[in-house]
């Protein structure tokens, strides 16, 4: 074996080793309500290799009742803000992308008084503060628009009220906030609505087939964003 050939082999091996050593998976932190928890089961599969998904802990308690925001369920914007005020102080919280949704729990209404859980002005303020916390950490962010309901179906739930017009209004508020900060959005509202009236298994949650479609849609949006980011940095 001549000297040049040996050098080529060594260089090739070193390049492969360097590539392996420098390999760094893309870390996502996904925070959202029960809809996020349900499509989250398939999100990793559709993202494929090279992605790590991190979440708020507590799946076992969160799945006991999807209407009660505990454990890994992010809940309303007030709860998300409180959680992030603590989370940003964790040195290990430094994902490559933060994917967020909150809204379904914000628009809950007391069936007796009609009082909404989080008023519009407070929702806007909470989102602004959330953005500020994440941007101060220099973490890129994506916003997932809140999924809708069909009022006549949701009305069967007697624990609390929720109306699609409120979801649309709060989605518009979120659009204004995040567009002003150039935060990319994933329009899960429109995508899910397009799946038809049979998409629900209860008042607000979706069939396994629709959950898989949601996961694939979100994964595709994230991968496209990442490819665009890679292109810009080349």
List the predicted regions and their residue ranges.
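Alpha-helical cap/lid subdomain in secreted, periplasmic
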Residues: 78-233
């Amino acid at each position: 074996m001549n000297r040049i050939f040996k050098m080529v082999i060594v260089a090739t091996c070193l390049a492969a080793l360097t590539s392996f050593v420098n390999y760094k998976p893309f870390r996502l932190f996904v925070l959202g309500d029960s809809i996020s928890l349900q499509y989250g089961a398939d999100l990793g599969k559709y993202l494929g290799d090279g992605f790590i998904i991190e979440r708020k802990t507590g799946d076992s308690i969160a799945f006991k009742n999807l209407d009660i925001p505990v454990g890994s369920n992010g809940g309303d914007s007030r709860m998300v803000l409180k959680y992030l005020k603590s989370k940003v102080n964790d040195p290990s919280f430094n994902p490559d992308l933060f994917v967020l949704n909150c809204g379904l729990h914000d628009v809950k209404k007391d069936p007796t008084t009609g009082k909404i859980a989080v008023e519009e002005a407070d929702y806007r303020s909470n989102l602004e503060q959330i953005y500020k916390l994440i941007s101060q950490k220099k973490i890129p962010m994506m916003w997932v628009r809140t999924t809708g309901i069909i009022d006549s179906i949701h009305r069967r739930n007697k624990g609390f009220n929720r109306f699609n017009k409120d979801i649309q209004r709060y989605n518009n508020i979120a659009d204004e906030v995040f567009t002003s900060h150039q935060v990319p959005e994933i329009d899960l509202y429109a995508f899910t609505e397009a799946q038809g009236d049979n998409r629900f298994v209860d008042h607000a949650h979706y069939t396994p087939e629709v959950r898989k479609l949601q996961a694939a849609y979100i994964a595709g949006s994230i991968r496209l964003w990442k490819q665009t980011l890679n292109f810009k940095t080349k």
